[in-house]
Amino acid sequence: MTTCVKDHACLFGDVEQGEMILNEYGHVVTKCWYDLTNHYAGITIDAFIVMPNHMHCIIVINNDVGAGLNNTVGAGFKPAPTDKRHGLSEIVRAFKTFSSRYINQIRNTLGMPVWQRNYYEHVIRTEKELQSIREYIVNNPIQWELDVENPQNMKDVGAGLKPASTKLKNA
């Protein structure tokens, strides 16, 4: 999954000599990403990188969450909230909400958007593909000078041009 900062603003830090140096906002994003496992049962945080104006990540959603629950419980009783199945869009929406709230508290800009509305997702189907994407994520700071999300490489920042191989989702 990839999600970008509103207007591609470089909000989370800088890449220096091929290494991502997070600022305070970048650390907030990292903390909020890790905290998702405290709010959603059955998810695992895999590789991720917070870049100056976007984030790449792999999140594993266990589709068996909630399996085996007795969904015919008595009137007024419901399975525990942590047993509920959660889709990627709900998880991304929560992450963006949590991180935006904290960042806006720090910079005293309550209610201002931090993230673009959408995100890019890709379902990983093979171990080979998983390894390739992990390498891409780890090497992203090294490739920053060539990155399509680097504002210096964008011809039409306002047009929201993206690689054709990604799938846009709302969050």
Question: Where are the regions that the model predicts?
Answer:
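Short catalytic/metal-binding and nucleic-acid-binding patches
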Residues: T2-A171
